[in-house]
A protein has these predicted regions:
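Compact soluble domain cores
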Residues: 19-38
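Arg/Lys-rich, positively charged N-terminal/basic patches that mediate binding to nucleic acids
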Residues: 1-22
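Basic/aromatic recognition patch in beta-strand/loop cores that engages polyanionic ligands
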Residues: 37, 41-81, 85
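Residues that form generic nucleotide/phosphate-binding pockets
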Residues: 14, 30, 100
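Enriched for short, Lys/Arg-rich terminal
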Residues: 68-108
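Amphipathic alpha-helical interface surfaces
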Residues: 7, 23, 27, 59-62, ...
Length: 108
């Protein structure tokens, strides 16, 4: 199986601040092996939230990665944030990301 990663500009900037390049590769490898491991976000149209350990952040310094798995072979990496700054997406954030995915996937 091949899994393609498409990163939003926001995600690319956030993940660079949160993970080392090696830790980011480990995250991608994990998603390659287990693409549906993130918890489904209720009412999001299929968005997933993956809990991941942050680089040098210790046991409690995890991050959250929000992504959308499309057709089982494409992962849209949308946003990432430290757990200690935000635990869940707000309803407005969830709606905005859902609309973004709906727009993108219907144009393809």
């Amino acid at each position: 199986m091949i899994l393609h990663f498409i990163e939003s500009p926001v995600y690319s900037q956030q993940i660079d601040d949160l993970l080392s390049p090696e830790d980011h590769r480990q995250l991608q490898l994990y998603l390659f092996q287990f693409p549906d491991q993130g918890d489904l976000i209720k009412g999001s149209g299929g968005l997933r939230k993956l809990r991941w350990a942050g680089s040098g952040r210790g046991k409690r310094g995890g991050i959250r990665v929000i992504y959308y798995l499309w057709h089982g072979d494409t992962a849209f990496m949308l946003t990432a944030y430290p757990k200690n700054e935000q635990t869940d997406l707000t309803p407005a954030q969830t709606r905005a990301l859902k609309q973004l995915i709906e727009k993108y996937t219907t144009e393809r």
